[in-house]
């Protein structure tokens, strides 16, 4: 970062550690380096959540130092040069180039869209809608259709949609999602018709593998704690084994204590301090110590002092902060930056 020379001399730039720059910020810098048309061509292929994350990073990128911009450009070019040998398959080049530019999750989704196509554009259009609007669209549809929609969308959006349903219906849908393994082309065709889209023949003959225990657990992770507890209790009454399997796959804030030190350090770099402070207000001593030992001594002491001086806050505010940190952790896990270990052998 740039530092002012108190003697009025030349501004000195410190060395930039490219590994410490979040993926969204690197993507934002690269996109801002392009002309609007080229940047738009990339952005239009991103998923809604990805657009929000990268767009937010672009909005924040107002006072970037030339050193940081040059470091990102240099790292990008160095990565690209590794994959420009004549004779390399175009698919590998495309995938590796986009991974270098946008990060693994965004790049892989984009490559899949370009090379393979997504399953249903009718479903994709729902990702851009407000959860309450999606709920109003599917509320009177057959539970099978509702299940497909909720399984296909991002778990945080599905959780908000599920919260609009009556408790009995929400429980039924959650159990359907947990038991869903694949979707037949006829179901996708019916859903496309409902979405008023005409994509004849694009669904293909293969069944789409969506839903399942992991999908149900992910949705549960994003539900309000009260709703989550009620649904879990209702599920135990109906199918205790299924409820146990879902709970084993859920990752809650307290499970962060199982993340290795390197993962915690990476996570802390992406978590705003005010969010961390609120989240730790409701954390147990074991998790607090895990966090503190992965901060610098000075930062840990400051956080401890802030927590002691912090006035009482609403439980809902603490839970919201913890959910935000979990969302960041899941995103980093999806990018392969950290590994989250839950109650089961499977990792997120």
UniProtKB/Swiss-Prot annotation:
Annotated keywords: Bacterial flagellum, Cell inner membrane, Cell membrane, Chemotaxis, Flagellar rotation, Membrane
Compartments reported by the entry: Cell inner membrane; Bacterial flagellum basal body
GO cellular component, one term: bacterial-type flagellum basal body
Domain of life assignment: Bacteria
GO BP, one annotated term: bacterial-type flagellum-dependent cell motility
Motif Part of the EHPQR-motif, residue range(s) on this chain: 141-144
Pfam (any one): FliG_C
An MF annotation (GO) of this entry: cytoskeletal motor activity
Site residues, Part of the EHPQR-motif: 176
Bilayer disposition of the protein: Peripheral membrane protein
Function recorded in the entry: FliG is one of three proteins (FliG, FliN, FliM) that forms the rotor-mounted switch complex (C ring), located at the base of the basal body. This complex interacts with the CheY and CheZ chemotaxis proteins, in addition to contacting components of the motor that determine the direction of flagellar rotation.
Record family assignment: Belongs to the FliG family.
Protein name: Flagellar motor switch protein FliG
UniProt lineage: Bacteria, Pseudomonadati, Pseudomonadota, Gammaproteobacteria, Vibrionales
């Amino acid at each position: 970062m740039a530092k002012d020379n108190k003697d009025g001399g030349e501004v000195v730039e410190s060395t930039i550690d490219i590994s410490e720059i979040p993926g969204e910020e690197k993507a934002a810098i690269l996109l801002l380096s392009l002309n609007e048309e080229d940047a738009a061509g990339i952005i239009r292929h991103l998923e809604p959540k990805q657009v929000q994350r990268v767009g937010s990073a672009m909005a924040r990128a107002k006072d970037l130092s030339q050193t940081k911009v040059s470091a990102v450009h240099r790292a990008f070019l160095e990565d690209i040069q590794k994959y420009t040998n004549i004779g390399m398959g175009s698919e590998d080049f495309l995938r590796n180039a986009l991974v270098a530019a946008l990060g693994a999750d965004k790049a892989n989704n984009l490559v899949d869209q370009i090379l393979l196509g997504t399953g249903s554009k009718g479903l994709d259009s729902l990702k851009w809608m407000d959860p309450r609007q999606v709920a109003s669209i599917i509320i009177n549809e057959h539970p099978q259709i509702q299940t497909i929609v909720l399984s296909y969308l991002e778990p945080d959006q599905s959780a908000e949609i599920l919260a609009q349903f009556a408790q009995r219906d929400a429980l039924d849908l959650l159990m359907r999602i947990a038991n869903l393994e694949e979707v037949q082309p006829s179901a996708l065709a019916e859903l496309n018709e409902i979405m008023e889209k005409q994509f004849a023949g694009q669904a293909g003959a293969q069944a789409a593998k969506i839903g399942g225990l992991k999908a149900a657990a992910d949705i549960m992770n994003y539900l309000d704690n009260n709703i989550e507890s009620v649904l879990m209790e209702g599920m135990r009454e109906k199918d205790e084994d299924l409820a146990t399997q879902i709970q084993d796959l859920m990752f809650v804030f307290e499970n962060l204590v199982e993340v290795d030190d390197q993962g915690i350090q990476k996570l802390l770099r992406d978590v705003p301090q005010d969010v961390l402070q609120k989240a730790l207000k409701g954390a147990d001593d074991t998790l607090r110590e895990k966090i503190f030992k992965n901060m610098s001594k000075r930062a840990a002491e400051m956080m401890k002092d802030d927590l002691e001086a912090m006035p009482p806050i609403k439980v809902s505010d603490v839970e919201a902060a913890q959910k935000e940190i979990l969302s960041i952790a899941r995103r980093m896990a999806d990018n392969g930056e950290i590994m989250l270990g839950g109650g089961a052998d499977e990792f997120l």
